[in-house]
Amino acid sequence: MEAGLKQRVNALNAYLRDIYSDKQAIKDGIVPEEYVYTSAGYFPQVNGVTPPGGVFAHIAGEDLVQGQDGQWWVLEDNLRIPSGASYPLFARDIERRITPSLFRNVRVRDNRDYPRLLRQSMDSSPPTA
């Protein structure tokens, strides 16, 4: 799942690079121009701007659900502020306190270092010119 989400965020960054430069997705009719130009998230001031490292979105919030058949689905790609990032941290902390036995025998990826990793990621991003 992690590899797929990384691939998805890379694709979203490639899309933003295109929309703010060559606009090939619009020219090829893949995305109707009115969808782009009327979007509240589109900023014409960014046209022609290449951000440091070519990365437009440093943080992404992917809303996922799992179907009854076990298949995972992405409901939404959120490239704005990851407002829900703290919810899993608090939920996992409560789960560890209430049912610590669940975490002993199951490989659950630890999420407590998320704030540090986010800070490290943002600090390693080149400053804007």
Show which residues each predicted segment covers.
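Preference for protein termini
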Residues: M1-A129
